[in-house]
């Protein structure tokens, strides 16, 4: 009765930037939910609509392959993050991000984000970018190659050991 679902093709069909999605909500919330959804996915051009239909109606084996690749990379990034002194990561259940706990490193989320970018050339997002409760966390993406993930986490591990994190 109070559930609103807003979704799209960005992650499932790797159609980021196409700005196509949908909303499902109870009739009594339709006006408010439409206002919320209208700026996200309105005025979608015909070519994008046809591409979205093709994605839905076409073979789904590539979606399954993509999901399996993300699971493999997710497992890799969580396993390797948990080997880094001062960091720990839970197994995420959605999207393609992990949010490792970095509190034992004694660095703030912003300090960690800056250090990783400037010292190691690894782009991350500070947990505080998602609100005050994100302090003590950093976001890693596993929407990258296994080789890049391995390289990045090996660099972080080496830095952590050399600088006595945790």
Task: Explain the meaning of each model-derived region.
Residues 1-166:
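PLP-dependent class I/II
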């Amino acid at each position: 009765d109070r559930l609103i679902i807003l979704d799209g093709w960005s992650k499932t069909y790797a159609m980021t930037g196409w700005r196509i999605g949908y909303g499902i909500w109870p009739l009594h919330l339709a006006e408010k939910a439409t206002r919320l959804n209208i700026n996200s996915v309105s005025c979608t051009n015909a070519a994008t609509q046809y591409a979205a239909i093709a994605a839905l109606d076409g073979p789904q084996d590539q979606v399954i392959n993509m999901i399996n690749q993300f699971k493999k990379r997710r497992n890799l990034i969580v396993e390797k993050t948990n080997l880094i002194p001062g960091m720990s990561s839970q197994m995420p259940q959605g999207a393609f991000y992990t949010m490792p706990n970095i509190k034992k490193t004694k660095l703030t989320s912003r300090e960690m984000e800056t250090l990783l970018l400037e010292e190691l050339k690894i782009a991350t997002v500070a947990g505080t970018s998602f609100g005050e409760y994100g302090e003590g966390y950093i976001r890693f993406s596993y929407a990258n190659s296994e080789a890049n993930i391995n390289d990045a986490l090996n660099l972080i591990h080496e830095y952590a050991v050399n600088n006595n994190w945790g």
